[in-house]
Amino acid sequence: MEGSSSYEVPSVAAADLEEGAGQTRSLPATPSKDVHKGVGGIIFSSSPILDLSESGLCRLEEVFRIPSLQQLHLQRNALCVIPQDFFQLLPNLTWLDLRYNRIKALPSGIGAHQHLKTLLLERNPIKMLPVELGSVTTLKALNLRHCPLEFPPQLVVQKGLVAIQRFLRMWAVEHSLPRNPTSQEAPPVREMTLRDLPSPGLELSGDHASNQGAVNAQDPEGAVMKEKASFLPPVEKPDLSELRKSADSSENWPSEEEIRRFWKLRQEIVEHVKADVLGDQLLTRELPPNLKAALNIEKELPKPRHVFRRKTASSRSILPDLLSPYQMAIRAKRLEESRAAALRELQEKQALMEQQRREKRALQEWRERAQRMRKRKEELSKLLPPRRSMVASKIPSATDLIDNRKVPLNPPGKMKPSKEKSPQASKEMSALQERNLEEKIKQHVLQMREQRRFHGQAPLEEMRKAAEDLEIATELQDEVLKLKLGLTLNKDRRRAALTGNLSLGLPAAQPQNTFFNTKYGESGNVRRYQ
């Protein structure tokens, strides 16, 4: 991790990888007084690690003069200021954890440190990084998570540790030169575009960097030009001989303990980031490919003649496609129409089922009424014929008791033709009415069957026609009842007429009193004496 530039960690990624360093080990929770009491023995101790996390420290005093100290854990305290000679008193420090404190600035003496590799500043109200931090060539990991940084700009911070140090070195070189009035009117460095930002590249070794520093000290203007040129994409193949030498040196390679510590810290920070993503729906640890391409667009080497014709990456290629309000309104309208159509179809099906149920119930009632009428008719037909036979057998003629002769009740010569023809006419009329009713009923049944076969009409129209059919059926039923009632009345009248004739003929057959019937006596005398 520490020996080559391939282990460089960007600030945002380092924040994710170094979240919970203080959570991996058992942290002492003793107050600051106890800490000050026990530090006296630590000063002369040869232990390279000192853990004072969550100790309630408010300031750092001379108790930290431990030259052999390599790892110092001060997270979750109340520190506000770091002494100016802090890094000079701890020359062998490689790991410094200052997370969750109240530090607003770092001392400028950090630039002279030669062994610092990891610096954790998460959750500190720090707004500006010291320019001297760019000269710490041994720094491999920098955690700036949740820090309200204003210098360097956020675009530079997002590029990573290499870009931050390069920006700070360039700033220091530019502001160390004497400026003319024209250079003072130049726009500030913070108004940089994406194309002007530094890109992470291969770092040179410490010897090469020292040689370059010596050259820059001799020629400041040339150093500025070289620092500016380092922002542009490389044109020539870099010389890797120095890089190979630095890679071969064993002292630059990370130790097994540091690798284990980095890995453990990374695992805990990844778990913490997963919890944050689930809670607040934050962005992923790695940027999308489109954003990476937009940030690293300066790596591409454009042709000189096509510099002004090249199109910048549009927002559509970086951001996801969003529906316009018009398209959203159209989609919502279509969804509403589909719901309305489904509801309308369901209502039509329900109305059709209800209509079929009503028609079935009406047909069942009509059949029951017809069956009752048929049974009544059969009962009447069973009762009437025996009476007719009895009347016909008993009323062919009347018996005269005087001369013991049968006298016809209605002599053929004396019967009126109208009385003989009236029963025949009534029978013909009743038969004609019955035929007409049968034809009407058949036509009505055929119409109902045709309507049932055709289902293309609206439910309301079908309900109206069903009501009309029901009214017609009730009218036909009333006519049938009237016709049957008329037939029964005619039969009763004929029966009453027959019984009346019998009552008129029976007294003539009985013995008559001749003393009270002078007319009969006179007629009898006439008959006798003639």
From Swiss-Prot:
LRR repeats mapped onto the chain: 46-67, 68-89, 92-113, 115-136, 138-159
SMART domains xrefs: LRR_TYP
InterPro entries named in the record: Leu-rich_rpt, Leu-rich_rpt_typical-subtyp, LRR-SigEffector_domain, LRR_dom_sf
Ranges for region Disordered: 178-215, 402-432
Disulfide bonds, paired cysteine numbers: none
Recorded coiled-coil stretches: 327-385
Region forming the signal peptide: none
Keywords: Coiled coil, Leucine-rich repeat, Repeat
Stated name of the protein: Leucine-rich repeat-containing protein 27
Organism per entry: Homo sapiens
Lineage summary: Eukaryota, Metazoa, Chordata, Craniata, Vertebrata
